[in-house]
């Protein structure tokens, strides 16, 4: 019995060493692809006011019908994500007593752990996803239906300053883009990355683009249409060029 345990242990250690060696071999030989978003020399601050990053992903500051301002990066996000992550943050205000639309971009660096499955992050901060759908947004000058996005209708209970607990609702829209690739599916993104690493020796440098707005219950479709107009106007400036859709 002891000899069998020894054989199993040695075999397991050998496999672990071989796997570790293979990972090191891949890391040394896999090159990083070009980003599918525009990077500019615009610094972003953390919520505490310190410099978070000297470069950022470009988000247009002027769009028809919207005023905008730069957003700050939460300290928790900065401490959780790898230091080579590049961010983009901006809030768009359409006036007319409508809630602002928050735009966010997370661009991975050599450390591919910058981007996680959106469902995990959202539920981790208290949101409940009520409905998940795939939608298409028409972008002027792009092929019809080329921007496919995921849409989450969500709800959350928050505590106000006076101690009262209230329910809020929101619409969250996102997709992923790299150089020459776009997908609304996290699983497709991961599979594409594996394919490119194994077949091309190249890791796509994915960006996770998302937009969020609060929404009154029952007005989610109206909110999505308003967000769609903003996204259609913004995305040609965010992405480096029209991409090839991937699923």
Where are these regions (language model features)?
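A short, solvent-exposed beta-edge/loop patch
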Residues: 4-28, 136-247
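Short, charged helix-to-loop "capping" segments that act as catalytic/coupling loops
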Residues: 34-41, 57-59, 198-200
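Amphipathic alpha-helical segments
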Residues: 54-73
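Short, solvent-exposed recognition patches
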Residues: 49, 67-199
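Envelope-exposed proteins and targeting segments
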Residues: 64, 99-101, 205-207
């Amino acid at each position: 019995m002891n000899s069998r345990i020894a054989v199993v242990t040695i075999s397991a250690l050998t496999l672990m060493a071989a796997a570790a060696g293979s990972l090191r071999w891949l890391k040394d030989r896999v090159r990083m692809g070009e980003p599918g978003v525009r990077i500019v020399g615009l610094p972003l601050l953390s919520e505490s006011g310190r410099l978070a990053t000297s470069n950022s992903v470009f988000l247009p500051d002027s769009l028809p019908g919207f005023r905008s301002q730069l957003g700050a990066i939460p300290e928790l996000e900065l401490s959780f994500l790898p230091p080579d992550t590049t961010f983009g943050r901006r809030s768009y205000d359409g006036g007319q007593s409508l809630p602002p639309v928050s735009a966010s971009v997370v661009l991975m660096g050599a450390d591919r752990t910058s981007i996680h499955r959106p469902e995990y992050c959202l539920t981790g901060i208290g949101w409940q996803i009520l409905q998940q759908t795939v939608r298409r947004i028409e972008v002027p000058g792009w092929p019809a239906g080329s921007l496919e996005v995921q849409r989450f209708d969500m709800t959350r209970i928050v505590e106000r300053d006076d101690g009262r607990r209230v329910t809020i609702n929101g619409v969250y829209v996102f997709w992923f883009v790299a150089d020459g690739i776009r997908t609304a599916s996290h699983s497709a993104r991961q599979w594409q990355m594996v394919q490119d690493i194994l077949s091309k020796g190249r890791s796509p440098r994915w960006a996770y683009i998302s937009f969020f707005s609060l929404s009154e219950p029952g007005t989610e479709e109206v909110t999505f249409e308003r967000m769609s107009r903003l996204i259609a106007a913004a995305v040609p400036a965010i992405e480096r060029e029209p991409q090839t859709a991937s699923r």
